[in-house]
Every structure is written in C-alpha cells, then in structure tokens.
Amino acid sequence: MGGGVSVELPKRDPPPGVPTDEMLLNVDKMHDVIAPAKLLEYVHIGPLAKDKEDKVKKRYPEFRLVNTGPGGLSALLRQSYNGTAPNCCHTFNRTHYWKKDGKISDKYEEGAVLESCWPDVHDTGKCDVNLFDWCQGDTFDRNICHQWIGSAFNRSDRTVEGQQSLINLYNKMQTLCSKDASVPICESFLHHLRAHNTEDSKEMIDYILRQQSANFKQKYMRCSYPTRDKLEESLKYAEPRECWDPECSNANVNFLLTRNYNNLGLCNIVRCNTSVNNLQMDKTSSLRLSCGLSNSDRFSTVPVNRAKVVQHNIKHSFDLKLHLISLLSLLVIWILIVAI
C-alpha cells in the first residue's frame, strides 16, 4: 500500500478588502440626496455607527432607519411628508425645507430638521383651505394667488378627495365674489373663468357680476349697465355700442358681462391702442409696449392738415411755362396743316 505525498504550499495573507460603493457613502454629506426621496423609497446611506442613529433619526423624522447589511450598512425609508401648509403652499417652487429654532431655510445647517412638502401639493387641493384664507389677507403674494387660482382649472387629480376639494373651492369663491368682486382673489377668479371659456364658466361670471352692489356696478360696470341716454344713442349706429362707448373700451374686462365681452371682441381696431387689464410682474420683470414703430420719427402722430399738404405739393412741383406751351401748340398745328 503506497503512501500519499503531501505538498506544503506557501502561506500568503489574503488581499485587503475593497469597499463597495455603498460602504463609501456618508450620511452627513447626503442632505440633498435624501430630501427628494419619494414615498416608500429607500435611500442607502452607507455604514452608520450606533452612536449616530439617534442623530440621523432626529434629522430625518419622515424616514424610518433600516439595516441593509453587515458593518452597520443602513438605509432610510420615507414614510411621510411633514411640511406645513404655510411653508409649502405659499410658493410653487419648494419641495422641502430645513427647520431650526422656528426658522426655515432651503439649505441644510447643523441641527436642522427636514420637513418635506407633499408632491404636487397644489394640484391635489391640499393648499386650497390655506390659500383661500391667505389670499384674502394683508401679506399675500398676488402672483402666487393668481397662479393658484389658474392651476385649479387644470388639475390632474381625479380622486374623490381632490374633486371634492375643487368643488368646495368653487363654491367658496362664488360666495365670496358675489359679495365683492373687486377683491384681488376674485378678480383673478373671474379672469380664469373667462379664460376657461365654457358655458358653465360664462354663467358663473354673469351670476357673480349680477350680484354686485349698486355702488360696484356704478363704479366698475357702466358698460354693462349703461344709462338710458347711452342706449338711445346706440340706436344711431350699426356697430355694437361696445366699440365706441368709452365706458366699454376703458372698462376692466373682468367686470364685463359675457354679452358685452363678446360684443367687444367684434370691434375693429382702427388706431394704435394698448389696454392692460391684468399684469402680473415681479422685481425681475420688464415691460415694453410698441405700436410697431422702430423709432418715434417714422410716423407723425399729429393729425394731418390737408390744406397744408396741398400747398406743399404745389410749392414743390415743377414750374409750368404757359407761354412756351402755347407756342409749341401753334407750331404743331402749322406743321400738320403744311403736311396735309
């Protein structure tokens, strides 16, 4: 029976471990990565020491800390959105913010806590109650309120909750604006109702405007409620009254009944005229108005004096020599007689 042969191999130390991408993550440098996470989305944050867990949980209260592997590998799972309506609804650009000592900031600073806004918070109607009150106050931003009212007519939220919020908003706006349509939020509402351009929106416009007080109609709706003399005068013209009545051409179109608004659209513009009824601007906006002129000297804005034009043409025309013309005429006649 033969004996086996054993060979002793040289011993070598194993190669050092190569860290994975997850092991190289540092939760303290991931503020902008963690904050945008969607509901039930995991965000891997790398190895996390036990003594740092409480600090991370306090910084991200909307997330649940979960273990994902050996060596303290961890991840955060989004479970909620804790942003408040005043901080999320009064702007269309904010997705999250950091709160510290009662103050908020868009950038992280040590000791701050993350609060996130619900995705598409304006589209879902979650801001309706807050903005309805805020836009009637003294500190509202007119551009934000105008944009919010406009977005209400184009919401994609078809859930029962979203549709009910929209119905409630329309009802509250109709009640508020029927009392006084000059409130800024009501003027925006009427503007977007007009732009919506449906039979229902037209009926709501007319209903709201007809409910206005006598003082309101006298101040803002003289086109829609003309005097008897103005009505009698309108019988003399074939074109709609809205085309020549200054009370219509100078009126705020948001306060025109649908009939008057439509008639105004039938008018032909025969002069250069600009009328701005709704203008939303901020500190970065600029405005330029032009009537198609490249410079102020291209056309004269002074009324034409026809008599002066005729005199100018005569003065600069060629000088007629009547005696010379007479002699030439006689010469031509003589030549014709001789030739015959």
Swiss-Prot record:
The chain crosses the membrane at residues 320-340. Component of the entry fusion complex (EFC), which consists of 11 proteins. During cell infection, this complex mediates entry of the virion core into the host cytoplasm by a two-step mechanism consisting of lipid mixing of the viral and cellular membranes and subsequent pore formation. Residues 1-20 are annotated as: Disordered. A lipid is attached at G2 (N-myristoyl glycine). Interacts with OPG143. Component of the entry fusion complex (EFC) composed of OPG053, OPG076, OPG086, OPG094, OPG095, OPG099, OPG107, OPG143, OPG104, OPG147 and OPG155. Except for OPG095 and OPG053, each of the EFC proteins is required for assembly or stability of the complex. This is Entry-fusion complex protein OPG094. It is a single-pass type II membrane protein. Belongs to the orthopoxvirus OPG086 family. It comes from Variola virus (isolate Human/India/Ind3/1967) (VARV). It is found in: Virion membrane. GO terms for biological process: fusion of virus membrane with host plasma membrane; symbiont entry into host cell. Keywords: Fusion of virus membrane with host cell membrane, Fusion of virus membrane with host membrane, Late protein, Lipoprotein, Membrane, Myristate, Signal-anchor, Transmembrane, Transmembrane helix, Viral envelope protein, Viral penetration into host cytoplasm, Virion, Virus entry into host cell. Unglycosylated because produced in viral factories instead of the classic ER -Golgi route. InterPro entries: Pox_virus_G9/A16 (IPR004251). Residues 2-319 are virion surface. Induction: Expressed in the late phase of the viral replicative cycle. GO terms for cellular component: membrane; viral envelope; virion membrane.
